[in-house]
Amino acid sequence: MRFAILSVHIAAASVGLLAGFVALYAAKGARLHRRSGTLFVYTMVAMAVLGAGIAAVWNVGPEVNIPVALLTSYLVITALTAVTPAAERSRALDVGLLLVACGVAVFMIGSGLAVATDGARHRVPAFPFFLFGAIALLAVVGDLRVLRSGARAGASRIARHLWRMSAALLIASLSFSVQLPKYLPKSLRLPWLLALPLLAVLVTMLFWLWRVRVRRPVRGMVIAAPRGALVTETA
């Protein structure tokens, strides 16, 4: 049973990573970008749910893996709602997702402080707790702004979508880089090689955020796609 669930988890993660990188480098707003991005969202949620279940049932670092699974699901779902037309969005869903992010932020930062003072839990140092807690806290700030001022528009909307999708891909890539050495020959366990996916996501995310926020307006980039229609930001 565990092997079957783990196999589906790994398969979802593999498909999700591939779809995520395709969406990251595909022409923004094109059909390939939208379809691969949607596939990335679905597979990341599936991967996260299965990962949380594995962590809870078989005690595989639950204090880290369960909140990270919640954070990953939260990031891709809110990235998707960021480009959903306001008329099709639910405020109750937005509030519920905000509470999830708040819970993750409080738990991870609190756990990080506990690990820093009492020693590592399950051989996990304090840094990952603080890292994921900071990501969740940053997302909470963005959600509060949306709930207070309404849905973002234009470049702000695109930036919200971009960084959340990229952060989820970064988390998936980090997990991949941590687990991959177990299956590689010793000669290929090179730190710079394992860090390449992380660097690729981080650099590409920063580039697009710079392009969206500094080089505005962005011609031909989709800011919403209601029911298959293409809505673009024009100069």
Residue ranges and their predicted role:
Residues 1-235:
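Alpha-helical membrane insertion/targeting regions
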